[in-house]
Amino acid sequence: MFTGIVEEIGEVTTLNTTSPDGGTTLTIALPPTSTLLSDCHLGDSIAINGVCLTVTTFLPQSFTVGIAPETLRLTNLGSLTPSSRVNLERAVRADTRMGGHFVQGHVDTTATILSKIPDGNAITFRFAPKNKDVLRYVVYKGFIALDGASLTVTKVNDEEGWWEVMLIAYTQEKIVTAAKGVGETVNVEVDMTAKYVEKSIQGYLAGMMEDGQGLPWLQKMVERIVAQGFS
C-alpha cells in the first residue's frame, strides 16, 4: 500500500529483458543524497511509476526489481530506457502520514497525454485512457494516481473519453509527469474506493432483484432521473 506522495525521482540504469532467471529486471539509481534505501530489506515493496514491485537486490544508492510479463503488458515500464526518470515511493508503515490517498500499486491501464497547457505557473494535462472502462471511476475532484502520484481530477468528459489534472509549480519539481510531452503515456490507477462502492451496489441490487424488490425501486429511480432531466 502507498500514499501517492512521491518520495524520490530515480534514474533507470538497466532494463534487462534477458535476465538469467528468465524474467525482466529493472535497476534504478538514486541521487547521491537519497536515503530511500536506508531501511530497505530484500523483498520490500517499492512503487516505480505507480507499479508495486519487489526489491530483489540493493546497494546504498541503487536497487533492482523483477517485472512480470503481465506487468509489462499493462504498464509503461517496458518503454523505459537507460536514463529514464521514474517516480519512487516506499510502501507505507503504520506511522506513515496519509498525505495523498490509498494507492495499491496495481495499475489499471495506461493513458496518453492529449494536451499540456500552461496556466500561470501551473500546467493542465489532459489524458485519454487506453482502457475506456476506467472512466466510470474518474470523477470531478476525485483522486487518481498517475505514474504513482496522487492527483486531483479537475475536469472529466465521459463522452469524449478524457480527464484533466493540474500540476502546481511545487508538484512539477517532484514528479516525472511534468517533463512528459503530448503523446507520452502514464500509468493509471483509479481510486480503489470507487471500485468497492460499485461492487457493493451491484451486490445490493442483485439481492433486491432476487427478492422481487429491485424492479419497482429501479423504475422509481429512472422516473426521478427523467423528471430531473426534463424539469
Role assignments for model-derived ranges:
Residues 1-231:
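Conserved loop->alpha-helix
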